[in-house]
Regions:
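Active-site lining segments that contact anionic ligands and/or coordinate catalytic metals
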Residues: 78, 98, 189, 203-204
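C-terminal helicase lobe
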Residues: 3-176, 182
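Minor-groove-contacting beta-hairpin "wing" of winged helix-turn-helix DNA-binding domains
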Residues: 41, 199-209
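Short intrinsically disordered, low-complexity coil segments enriched in acidic
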Residues: 1-4, 221-222
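Short linear regulatory motifs embedded in intrinsically disordered, acidic Ser/Thr-rich regions
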Residues: 242-251
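A short, conserved structural fragment
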Residues: 83, 183-199
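Short, amphipathic alpha-helical interaction segments positioned at domain boundaries
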Residues: 51, 56, 208-238
């Protein structure tokens, strides 16, 4: 990014970077004139597997990617603190943020009608997910990609029942976003792991059980931001038809 311009007001990532070092460099293009600027990062579950296939051959590629994913999915800690900690800067504290990041802003405004931060004990859900992966590999001789695993979890009655209890949703079906967050969290904490299959034309990422993790009773609590409002979503069919009703707004 050869941008020699001091008054950049926005840096927008439509996808995650491969590492926090890269993201720090790229977002650092904003606000070099000492005035405030916004850095917006758009993250989705498929980014993890797309980027993992790109960095799988690098010695520290996956470890650095997991740091980046942890930054993206953390709903609680200060964003700047996460960057500083992972880059070895111990001088920065959350108080220095001054509510500049979304997590610090959320805690300062305390809008409980919009979202609630909860800590989830995932032992039972992790066991059910591992059993699902084991059953698929044993009975169907099938390896599961990340998106396919989410599809299976949303259709599995046992996993749905466990998730409803964890989220205190007795009747409402848990959203796909919850399972995506859970699998991402399990991968970066190595409760599950990625298995790569190399072809002449591509690298395919599969999610498999981590046999090195035997004791599921002492896993960390998973922080999750539970939305208290029904989000409005635009859905596109399999042919990815263009939505013509969307109004175009001129920001200039």
């Amino acid at each position: 990014m050869g941008i020699d311009k001091a008054d950049v007001r926005f840096v927008i990532h439509f996808s995650s970077s491969k590492s926090l070092e890269n993201y720090y460099q790229e977002s650092g293009r904003a606000g070099r004139d000492s005035n405030s600027a916004d850095c917006i990062l758009m993250w989705r579950f498929s980014d993890l597997f797309r980027l993992a296939s790109m960095v799988s051959s690098e010695r520290t590629g996956i470890a650095k990617l997991y740091q980046m994913v942890g930054y993206c999915i953390d709903p609680n800690k200060c964003r700047r603190y996460l960057i500083s900690k992972n880059l070895g800067d111990t001088s920065w504290s959350t108080d220095d943020c001054k509510n500049a990041c979304d997590n610090c802003q959320r805690k300062s405004t305390n809008k409980s009608d919009v979202s609630t931060l909860i800590q989830i004990k995932t032992n039972e859900l992790l066991n059910a997910t591992k059993q699902l992966l084991f059953d698929q590999s044993l009975t169907k001789q099938e390896r599961i990609t990340g998106p396919k695993l989410i599809d299976l979890m949303t259709c599995n009655k046992q996993i749905q029942s466990i998730s409803q209890k964890l989220l205190n949703k007795n009747q409402e079906k848990p959203e796909r976003q919850f399972y995506e967050h859970f699998i991402s969290w399990c991968l970066i904490h190595q409760y599950l792991k990625l298995d790569f299959h190399f072809t002449p034309y591509s690298t395919v990422c599969y999610v498999v059980n981590n046999d090195n993790i035997v004791d599921n009773e002492h896993i960390e609590l998973m922080p999750y931001l539970l939305s208290n409002k029904k989000e409005e979503c635009f859905h596109v069919d399999a042919k990815r038809k263009r939505i013509h009703s969307t109004e175009i707004v001129d920001l200039t």
